[in-house]
Swiss-Prot record:
CDD domains: AmyAc_Glg_BE, E_set_GBE_prok_N. It comes from the Bacteria. One of its GO terms (molecular function) is 1,4-alpha-glucan branching enzyme activity. This is 1,4-alpha-glucan branching enzyme GlgB. It catalyses: Transfers a segment of a (1->4)-alpha-D-glucan chain to a primary hydroxy group in a similar glucan chain. One of its GO terms (cellular component) is cytosol. The keyword Glycosyltransferase applies.
Amino acid sequence: MTHLSPEAFAIIEGRHADPFRYLGQHDVDGRTVIRAFLPEASRVEAVGDNGEVAPLARIHDAGLFTGTMSGPQRYRLRATFGDHVTDLEDPYRFLPILTDFDLHLLGEGNHERLYDKLGAHPMVLDGVDGVGFVVLAPNARRVSVVGDFNFWNARRHPMRVRGNGYWELFIPRAKAGDHYKFDIIGPQGEHLPLKSDPMAFAAEMRPKTASIVVDETRLPRPRPAPSDINKLDRPVSIYEVHLGSWRRKDNNQWLTYRELAEQLPAYARDMGFTHIEFLPVSEHPFDGSWGYQPTGLFAPTSRFGSPEDFCALVDACHREGLAVWLDWVPGHFPDDPHGLGHFDGTALYEHANPMQGRHLDWGTLIYNYGRTEVANFLRSNALFWLERYGIDGLRVDAVASMLYLDYSRPSGGWIPNKYGGRENLEAIEFLRRTNIEVFGHFPQATTAAEESTAWPQVSRPVDIGGLGFGYKWNMGWMHDTLRYVGKDPIHRKYHHGEILFGLHYAFSENFILPLSHDEVVHGKRSILGRMPGDDWQRFANLRAYYSFMFGHPGKKLLFMGCEIAQEREWNHDSSLDWHLLGDAKYAGIQALIRDLNHLYRNQPALHERDCEPEGFDWLITEDADRNVFAWVRKGFDERARCVVVVNFSPNVYYNYRVRVPLGGTWREVFNSDSSHYGGSNVGNVGQVHASEDQQLNLILPPMAAVFLVPEA
């Protein structure tokens, strides 16, 4: 054997940090030298474009070959494996993938289209088909691509490191559909678990964890939703859906994206919803996380099909006129060995200090928003879903956990910011910039924050000090009102303020009223399960509460199953209890939600000024003894008015007087006590005439709400 250099041994042992320095074509003392590493090959030749064939000598039994050609030229390798001879392109003859400008933007953390450069991209280089791989691992000693194309041999395709710690390699003949991972040696020479690609566009079905090459430029682009569908003056009624448990096959198997596309959008449209919000669809290893612990932020989960199939689902929603929102999780990630944690042998995506980098409640890792590469990665992910899949909005999960350094931490268990405060300044900057970029690139899209504290101006523009979200979930409204309706009616007069209090701050943000998945799990019971009394009272209570919600200022969100009054808590491992609709009580609730949605959409007074104080006036606030509330909703037109009267007691009230803003005849356009919904059919015979002093003399049905609008 020829005496080998340390570089040659580094190639053989799979630990060379810059294989292009040794492999490929090089000028050595005026000679054109070709070196190749092909384990299992018994013979290798270099075949030049000019027809020259140069034999390469085997200089090590591991598969290291070298030889000379007459001069620099394009070439390919002709290798013999057993009885088989094949021509191969040499990955180490190609120029870099990333440009200097790419590296400049990556170094600044300003590459808005990170998904065009990082990850795995089918491409043609120098006339050769293959896949370009790029990954961030600044502290790694060596990174290799392993996959179907090299028998998962880390010595076959070590990558080259570019500026700022980005590793890249073009692998000829790799193709869409190939499975792959990154094999990384850490800064101390330690061999890390194989890592999935943080930028992968698809991944294997759990429990397998390989990434899958996708030519995402060939993905079909879903048709757009109506451009004004997210605006503040439009009706926004959101159907929140967990794709794995909305409906299942007879064998309890999931519906695929395409099967969901055939059923879900048409159902949501028939029910009157304007939006569908999917619980996180990014790839995640644990079903029980519901998607809130993702490992593949750029990959729709393979549980239900391919990226193309997910496109079909989004397109089907848009075809029905529905906007699609995704739950987006930039707040934390799991520490599964194949994931982002300790990615290059150091805390790359997370904080090194567990007082900053580990979430105590969930056992997950927290992103280091102060690291430009990490913030760039997350912002780019937000833009990716909007551009590549035509998503119309992002609901950002667990914003409070991002904003506060001491979130769910004991005294002494957190690190203050540079001013000594508890605010996470880097997270604030990240959220603001994300919203600026989302609205800047996709003005028709929106964002919504699940923020459970009193942080100010969450849904106000960044230039006036806000966080820049389009909407904020009104968690306070949800907690107060559910607590109120959970009381026995005889005690509600002592809790009257829990209904009134929400209007003190109802217009401080652009609020969404959420009855979400979080309210029907972990022993909280279903929404119906929270209602007191016998069956009649429970269902009447629920009808009144839903009606109260749709009459209240704010956009609406209802988790799947709430619309059919599911009795049990939500279980992600099984379908909703659709069989309940065979019982008139449950079918009545479904009919109620359908009619409330259509009423909300068709009455401008109920949605045009959802987020403006000018769109609301109290009419009755002091009738605690009878558990009655009344208010008027107002649209832009002076006759766009809707009076809502809610009776949260089981009593019928006759001759109940309510002063209204306009004289004349008022039509009762909705009554939750209608027998159509399972009620007792007490009401106002369709219309009421206002007296000279603009008062209506009403019959208030028990545990019910009535909506009245002026005659045109």
